[in-house]
From Swiss-Prot:
Name of this chain's protein: Large ribosomal subunit protein uL2
GO CC terms, sorted: large ribosomal subunit
Endpoints of the signal sequence: none
Organism from which the protein derives: Shewanella baltica (strain OS155 / ATCC BAA-1091)
Keywords: Ribonucleoprotein, Ribosomal protein, RNA-binding, rRNA-binding
Record's keyword annotation contains Cell membrane: no
GO biological process: cytoplasmic translation
Length: 274
């Protein structure tokens, strides 16, 4: 994997930094694991904008990823690594011994031809998945479930990982990259290793159009709007907004705590670092 800075042959190329991975499959994805992906433009069923800055972009197919890794005891081989437009991580097409194919997240160091396995009997090796009760304390893992059988929810993006720091009774304690320490049931599954494509953070799109290809629309400052559109809007000439920063709906921003799910507070041992 290489980080390439483009020659400044045009204003749109001047600041482009690409991440090139020659190991990725150059053909079409596996058709049996594709699903239709409709664009909403950020609108809900009533036509109102519920998510800002969304719209347009290249047409995409969703890749059905196996986040549960519940095919226990059946060895599998990595057929190839692929690009996935729906996430920052790359994905791997896996062929099981019984003939079934699935997509999984491509871990750091994973290559075509590698053997992987899921379940209690799997060895401690990058790409293998098993319950947290069987994972040694101190191990680095990714694709961690929060509820047994629900599928991975933690550490799924490029370069992500968590560390198992303790195990006590029915819960294992994980240290997340944010600094948060969190308890997770020991029956939840995790996959050894880090998520691959960590160089993704080094890329630079270089121009506004590259954002539009990805379906991301412009973000307009509140002070540049009219009063009807934003609490910071209006005024004669340029203004500073005239109040502490708020969202378009008047909720304080920049450090204001909005977490309200007290029910799961008991699972957070330590809040994330600021």
């Amino acid at each position: 994997m290489a980080v390439i800075k483009c020659k400044p042959t045009s204003p749109g190329r001047r600041h482009v930094v690409k991440v090139v991975n020659t190991d990725l499959h150059k053909g079409k994805p596996f058709a049996g694991l594709l699903a239709k992906k409709s664009k909403s433009g950020g609108r809900n069923n009533t036509g109102r904008i519920t998510v800002r800055h969304v719209g347009g972009g290249h047409k995409q197919h969703y890749r059905l990823i196996d986040f549960k890794r519940d095919k226990d005891g059946i060895p599998a081989k990595i057929e190839r690594l692929e690009y996935d437009p729906n996430r920052t991580a790359n994905i791997a097409l896996v062929l099981y011994a019984d003939g079934e194919r699935r997509y999984i997240l491509a871990a750091k160091g994973m290559q075509a031809g590698d053997k992987i396995q899921s379940g209690v009997a799997a060895e401690i090796k990058t790409g293998n998945a098993m319950p947290l009760r069987n994972i040694p304390v101190g191990s680095v893992v990714h694709a961690v479930e929060m509820k047994p059988g629900k599928g991975a929810q933690i550490a799924r993006s490029a370069g992500a990982y968590v560390q198992v720091v303790a195990r006590d009774g029915a819960y294992a304690t994980l240290r997340l990259r944010s600094g948060e320490m969190r308890k997770v049931p020991v029956d939840c599954r995790a996959t050894f290793g880090e998520v691959g494509n960590a160089e993704h953070m080094l890329r630079q799109l270089g121009k506004a159009g590259a954002k539009r290809w990805r379906g991301i629309r412009p973000t307009v400052r509140g002070v540049a709007m009219n009063p009807v559109d934003h609490p910071h809007g209006g005024g004669e000439g340029r203004t500073s907004g005239g109040r502490h920063p708020v969202t378009p709906w008047g909720v304080p921003t920049k450090g204001y705590k909005t977490r309200s799910n007290k029910r799961t507070d008991k699972y957070i041992v330590r809040r994330r670092n600021k």
